[in-house]
Amino acid sequence: MEETLMKKSVLALAALGILAAPAAVIAQVYPAKTVRVVIPWPAGGSNDVVGRIVMQKLSESLGQQFVVDNRGGAAGSIGADVVAKAPPDGYTIMVHSTTHVGNAHLYGKKLTYDTLRDFAGVGMLSAQPGVLTVHPSLPVKTPKEFIALAKSRPGQINYSSSGNGSAPHLQMALLISMTGINITHVPYKGGAPQVTALLAGETQASFATVGTVINHIRSGKLRPLGLGSTKPSKALPNVPTLTEAGVPGYDMSPWIGVFVPAGTPKPIIDKLNAEINKALVLPDVVKSLENQALDAAPSTVDQFNTALKVDYEKYGKLIKLTGAKIE
């Protein structure tokens, strides 16, 4: 009875726009109504799949529906704009990827929001390790051999990406900047044509998320050389990280995480983070993510926000280095 009255009071305050109620009180009964989960990508992609898996668990554990609202377009910036303008009350949250920080540098002043100032990070959901992959016709089996071959054939090896400024483009740009190799970028419009070109031998190398190439690797149609993350991939346990395989310090692993509008009360952020982390260790969630060749990546709020700032700077430097931009 007492909890019901408290929930009604919180909803009344929210309806009146009164945000001065004690944050701890609001968080105690949060969520008191349906939560909108904006996923700024079409249904069926990694962000959507991961978001739905975890948000279903939050619906079950918190007793309110976390309803997905797919708002695709402009590499996630359309949906992000919706969240940036939403009330900071915990009832609009966003599932987005590393693309969020890249967009800040690709779109620049074209964005209607500030990537760091207008959002608060809640926590990471999963890591999407990228893997340096080559067509089997390229006579290399290790990152060191790839680098040596590229140096012996400056400008002759080409690599595909899913577009200018995309994660695969920037992952290779980092490798180029760290090793001094000279290889040619061939951008495609999306991950599917990027991988198709590599399979056909139109391009000879590429970075791709493990999930997009795992079946081709298992069938022998593509050859993995090294992971862009600092941790091994459960889907490719025999593939070393680039740091282990001769490129010390290489670390660029895309992720998927949860955000809220800036100004959302910290107790609500902390509560969401705790529930997300509980969900990420559930055996069925871990298994569902592994089926997508993704690794669960629980984090604290501070760890996630630190990663955001590090990747914001890293992506900014790489985008400036490549000259990539959205016209």
Which functions belong to the PLM regions below?
Residues A27-D118, Q156-N158, N164, G180-A205, ...:
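N-terminal (or domain-start) structured segment
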Residues D114-M124, S160, N182-P187, Q204, ...:
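Short beta-strand->loop
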Residues T4-L5, A21-A27:
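Sec/Tat signal peptide C-region and signal peptidase I cleavage site
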Residues A12-A21:
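Bacterial N-terminal signal peptides
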